[in-house]
Amino acid sequence: MSKQANNQNLDVNETLAKSEAIIVKYKKQIITAIVAIAVVVGGTFAYIYGYSKPREDKAQELLGIAMQKYIMTQDYEKALKGEGKTLGLEAIASKYGSTDAGNVAKYEAGLCLYQLGKTKEAIKYLEDFSTQGDATISAQALFALANCYAADKQLDKAVDTFKKAAKETNVPARSAEYLFQAGLILENQKKNDEALQVYQQIKADYPLAPICSRQQQGDVVLDAIIDKYIEKLSK
């Protein structure tokens, strides 16, 4: 065996010996640490399967009932408040707010309140809703929140939120529509230069969106909607 090989074996043996020495020296501390990890992991599983998961399942069940009985029939008041033994969205959001289903209940409650014209209450629920990184849901929630801000005359917030929704969605046509809503509000605020910039951005970034496409009516080809708004503010 070569001297280099002997040296390598010595290095390995020395490393192992040091490791064994460390284990012997700190045996009590290491065992304590392992037990602590086991307790944490065990506690986590106990929480998930003994408390968290049952709550999630129950919240999903209650949300499904409320959605089927009231949302589908557009009975927004009962959807919010419930009826008899059926919990409404407000109660589900309050009792199970830490669960995914309880979180969705906040979003649905916000939409129901908006439909009922209770925009300030709707805003509270929609602001409290967590999108949890889902781009589709995030864009829809931001769009709903922007509409609530607009209805509540919080126009600057509405514009900013429409723009955020446009960035969040991965559907170009929706991005164009959300930005268009922001442009309309800016026009309403007499901020024509800013509105024009938004309209020009729509035309440049989303040329295939319906709002940017020319429309045919019989033998007549109409200009794209966005072109009309750009022309109006360019004069």
Q: What is each residue range found by the language model?
A:
Residues 1-36:
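N-terminal positive-inside, membrane-proximal cytosolic segments immediately preceding the first
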Residues 93-102, 116, 130-139, 166-175, ...:
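Short solvent-exposed coil/turn linkers within tandem alpha-helical repeat scaffolds
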Residues 75-76, 82, 119, 155, ...:
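TPR-repeat structural position
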